[in-house]
């Protein structure tokens, strides 16, 4: 969930997931 579900967010925060 969270950033991991949003490609743009995941792209700028890869280590969050």
UniProtKB/Swiss-Prot annotation:
It is found in: Secreted. One of its GO terms (molecular function) is acetylcholine receptor inhibitor activity. Keywords: Acetylcholine receptor inhibiting toxin, Amidation, Disulfide bond, Ion channel impairing toxin, Neurotoxin, Postsynaptic neurotoxin, Secreted, Sulfation, Toxin. The keyword Ribosomal protein does not apply. Belongs to the conotoxin A superfamily. The modification Sulfotyrosine is found at residue 16. Disulfide bonds join 3-9, 4-17. The modification Cysteine amide is found at residue 17. The cysteine framework is I (CC-C-C). Alpha4/7 pattern. Alpha-conotoxins act on postsynaptic membranes, they bind to the nicotinic acetylcholine receptors (nAChR) and thus inhibit them. GO terms for cellular component: extracellular region; host cell postsynaptic membrane. Residues 5-7 are annotated as: Ser-Xaa-Pro motif, crucial for potent interaction with nAChR. The keyword Secreted applies. This is Alpha-conotoxin-like AnIC. InterPro entries: Conotoxin_a-typ_CS. Expressed by the venom duct.
